[in-house]
């Protein structure tokens, strides 16, 4: 066994969006699967974002600013992270295939709330990253 065989082979995770009730993969009008690609938790991009958020919280605490964290704060932080780790997508939203932006991703993840769960589940499952 070589430890390099257990090194991640990709810095991203592709999530095929599934109907929240039936589990069927959702399709765009052109018959392609609806997908969202996010940076994996071991990626440089993901880690930088987490460091940025943690540093902000630490700085706020050290300067005696707000130290209480509410459920709303946690939800906002989750939306912020998910929208910023989204690297690409192929989706139909509001009858169009929108260009990816952090703002559009936040809107999508807020309005179509079950997508967050599918992304978080895919990130948790992304430990299945080893070479065959």
Where are these regions (language model features)?
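C-terminal charged interaction modules
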Residues: 88-132
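Short, charged/polar N-terminal "headpieces" of proteins
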Residues: 1-60, 129-132
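Negatively charged, Asp/Glu-rich surface segments that serve as flexible interaction/assembly modules
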Residues: 49-88, 94
């Amino acid at each position: 066994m070589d430890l390099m065989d257990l090194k991640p082979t990709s810095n991203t995770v592709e999530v095929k969006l599934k109907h929240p009730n039936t589990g069927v993969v959702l399709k765009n009008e052109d018959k392609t699967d609806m997908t969202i690609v996010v940076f994996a938790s071991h990626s440089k991009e993901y880690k930088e974002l987490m460091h940025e958020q943690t540093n902000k919280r630490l700085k706020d605490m050290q300067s005696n600013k707000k130290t209480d964290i509410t459920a709303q704060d946690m939800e906002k932080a989750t939306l912020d992270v998910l929208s910023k780790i989204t690297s690409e997508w192929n989706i139909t939203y509001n009858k169009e295939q929108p260009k990816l932006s952090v703002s559009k991703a936040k809107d999508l993840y807020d309005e179509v709330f079950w997508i967050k769960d599918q992304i978080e589940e895919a990130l948790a499952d992304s430990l299945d990253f080893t070479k065959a």
